[in-house]
Swiss-Prot record:
Annotated binding of NADP(+), by residue: N85, S87, N135, S585, H589, R600, D602, R649
This protein's encoding gene: icd
Protein name: Isocitrate dehydrogenase [NADP]
Molecular function in Gene Ontology: isocitrate dehydrogenase (NADP+) activity; metal ion binding
Organism: Azotobacter vinelandii
UniProt remark on cofactor binding: Binds 1 Mg(2+) or Mn(2+) ion per subunit.
Length: 741
């Protein structure tokens, strides 16, 4: 590469809208410093369009940018800023396909039950786009996530609201005690490179190959586990009864987006059990209209619209009768009657549990009020972490954002580590029997008894990423002089193998004076919470799932959101992936923008990632201008926080676009004031003056654009001209940036 490049990703929903405003500013400020800022489209719509070129006209076709970035991530030149994207559930996938079809893209329909070879191929291609299809491709490194000092200081000065806790709160986590993934896990260490075969030997002796070939490397850990359908159903039935008896809300917390094979099936089992009476009574007609429990009870409401009105009313009445008998469900939207069981992707454990803990352990009930809640997290692997936090809050009260310590994370995720890489090795078992994993010589590595309907899965964790993860943990512990805790459970087969590797690889480093320990997740939570309450920091060194969960849990307690985290992925080949926060893509922000022209998305995550990206580029390419841009951007970000120029929540107040103006103003002022680079100083002195002189006018033009509905001709694939006009409504601001373009 001659010119150093930063790749800025185009994604979905609120961050995608914000990009229309922020990207022109980034390009304007970096253009003169020998830095090319390019975009690549990894949005849901973009990935759909790139996957089906043979259905499209030449002008509609686009390149497969995700595949290109996946290759780039394995090179030292990678410098990618990754914004949150949709991890599509089936309902979202179908909605995006429909929108594109209406825009003239002749994409095939999503075949729920493919019959022909063509339909099977179409479904397989669509299914690759489903769930968390982006992050595993780009994450060719492990994760370093922490709250930057400026953000932590701001949170201490301006604490977010935390709900008070009562010692007699009835809220708790409910998990299985047998028959889950945790209880059944087995693991093996791979001796030589090659591949393994996964097959089901049924009771009658017949054999079905579930996956013919999965490549493995020497030193890799593989594990397998089973979620028993019968054990899950028995557990759910008992918990429904218990919630009714205790008078608490029933809520279910899974991750149907990322765990796109296993969790929708578990969700479906819970829906089946809860609505059993109504679903059994109408089983025949529901089968005819194609209702799928895995898509939630919302799918039933959508599909019964094709039935005669009398039949619709009968089914709806029977569902209401279920609600009268069952415990009250936690609500996603009590005004609209949308329950926790409507859509699998509405309640996602890593976001929903911290929100519940922050709200005094309560969730919203059908009456629009907060109530104590039973949080059902079926598998035991990580459920205990949340139960410990609840117990701690019941004993000591809510956390205090003005004094609490921080829990930065070093997470193992490179090369699709652990559960988050298991989707292509997860199966719903069709018949009773045994699942066997064998190597190329036929040697048996793993074996498990299964019953029809069970979920069986295999996970992998390669040796090089584990070595890199241990190195990153030691580096962060040394750099910050903070205790580092490996969250590993010796009672789990997989973790026992990882512990052996961690103990071995720690010997490669000088750890004198460092506090590095290995604790089970439950013990690690207790240890970290005790330190948090003393105002002390503790590094969590975790596997892939806890990386995801904890980088929501602790930041939401500390900062009120996980979107304000610095999220760096030092790629194993030397490049950098800079993720903008750890939150999602905020569909409610888009809804508000379309209804009233107000975008409340906070781009702080993008500001932090851009500064880290510029710093990486400056060091990698010996580009001092990039380092000046990075340090002045950090100053500007700090000033936005100090002067309270982040987006508010309602029309008439500053929104995302206003915060971008202030970023440009403060960044230009910092560049004009610095003396390290005279060229940049001279170039930005005039810009800083123009923005300063026109502050009132620009703020007025941005405010005038609020308060009315906005039409951008699409949700997943909006019209670029209409969106740009809506997101950049200040002619004065646009003109001030023009000389830099």
């Amino acid at each position: 590469m001659s010119t150093p490049k930063i790749i800025y990703t185009l994604t979905d929903e609120a961050p995608a809208l914000a990009t229309y405003s922020l990207l022109p500013i980034i390009k304007a400020f970096t253009g003169s410093s020998g830095i090319a800022v390019e975009t690549r489209d990894i949005s849901l719509a973009g990935r759909l369009i790139a996957t089906f070129p043979e259905y499209l006209t030449d002008t509609q076709k686009i390149s497969d940018d995700l595949a290109e970035l996946g290759k780039l991530a394995t090179t030292p030149d990678a410098n990618i800023i990754k914004l949150p994207n949709i991890s599509a559930s089936v309902p979202q996938l179908k909605a995006a396909i429909k929108e594109l079809q209406q825009q003239g893209y002749k994409l095939p329909d999503y075949p729920e039950e493919p019959k022909t070879d063509t339909e099977k191929d179409v479904k397989a291609r669509y299914d690759k786009i489903k769930g968390s299809a982006v992050n595993p491709v780009l994450r060719e490194g492990n994760s370093d996530r922490r709250a930057p000092l400026s953000v932590k200081n701001y949170a201490r000065k301006h604490p977010h609201k935390m709900g008070a806790w009562s010692a007699d709160s009835k809220s708790h986590v409910a998990h299985m005690d047998n028959g889950d993934f945790y209880g059944s896990e087995k693991a093996a260490l791979i001796g030589a490179p090659g591949s393994v075969k996964i097959e089901l030997i049924a009771k009658d002796g017949s054999s079905t190959v579930l996956k013919a070939k999965t490549s493995v490397q020497a030193g890799e850990i593989i594990d397998s586990s089973v979620m028993s359908k019968n054990a899950l159903r028995n557990f759910i039935a008992a918990e429904i009864e218990d919630a009714k008896k205790q008078g608490v809300l029933l809520s279910v917390h899974l991750k149907a987006t990322m765990m796109k094979v296993s969790d929708p099936i578990m969700f479906g089992q819970i829906v089946s059990e809860f609505y059993k009476d109504a679903l059994t009574k109408h089983a025949e007609v529901l089968k005819q209209i194609g209702f799928d429990v895995n898509n939630g009870i919302g799918d039933l409401y959508a599909r019964i619209k094709t039935l005669p009105e009398a039949k619709q009313k009968e089914i709806e009445a029977d569902i209401q009768a279920v609600y009268a008998q069952r415990p009250q469900l936690a609500m996603v939207n009590s005004d609209k009657g949308i329950t926790n069981l409507h859509v699998p992707s509405d309640v996602i454990v890593d976001a929903s549990m911290p929100a519940m803990i922050r709200d005094s352990g309560k969730m919203w009930g059908p009456d629009g009020k907060l109530h104590d809640t039973k949080a059902v997290i079926p598998d035991r692997c990580y459920a205990g972490v949340y139960q410990v936090v609840i117990e701690d809050c019941k004993q000591h009260g809510a956390f205090d954002p003005t004094t609490m310590g921080s829990v930065p994370n070093v997470g193992l995720m490179a090369q699709k580590a652990e559960e988050y890489g298991s989707h292509d090795k997860t199966f719903q078992i069709p018949a009773d029997g045994v699942v066997r994993v064998t190597d190329e010589s036929g040697k048996l590595l793993l074996e498990q008894s299964v019953e029809a309907g069970d979920i069986w899965r295999m996970c992998q964790a390669k040796d090089a990423p584990i070595q890199d993860w241990v190195k990153l943990a030691v580096n962060r512990a040394r750099a910050t002089n903070t205790p580092a805790v490996f969250w590993l459970d010796p009672a789990r087969a997989h973790d026992a193998q990882v512990i052996a590797k961690v103990e071995r690889y720690l010997k490669d480093y000088d750890t004198s004076g460092l506090d590095i320990r290995i604790l089970s997740p439950v013990e690690a939570t207790r240890f970290s919470l005790a330190r948090i309450r003393e105002g002390k920091d503790t590094i969590s060194v975790t596997g892939n799932v806890l990386r995801d969960y904890l980088t929501d849990l602790f930041p939401i307690m500390e900062l009120g959101t996980s979107a304000k985290m610095l999220s760096i992925v030092p790629l194993m080949s030397g490049g950098g992936l800079f993720e903008t926060g750890a939150g999602g893509s905020a569909p409610k922000h888009v809804q508000q923008f379309l209804e009233e022209g107000y975008l409340r998305w906070d781009s702080l995550g993008e500001f932090l990632a851009l500064a880290a990206s510029l710093e990486h580029l400056g060091n990698a390419y010996k580009n001092p201008k990039a380092l000046v841009l990075a340090s002045t951007l950090d100053q500007a970000t700090g000033k936005i926080l100090d002067n309270n120029k982040s987006p508010a929540r309602k029309v008439g107040e500053i929104d995302n676009r206003g915060s971008h103006f202030y970023l440009a103003l403060y960044w230009a002022q910092a560049l004009a004031a610095q003396t390290e680079d005279k060229e940049l100083q001279a170039q930005f002195t005039g810009i800083a003056k123009a923005l300063t002189d026109n502050e009132t006018k620009i703020v007025g033009e941005l405010a005038a654009a609020q308060g009315k509905p906005v039409d951008i001709a699409g949700y997943y694939h909006p019209n670029t001209d209409l969106t740009s006009k809506a997101i950049r409504p200040s002619a004065t601001f646009n003109a001030a940036l023009a000389p830099l373009a």
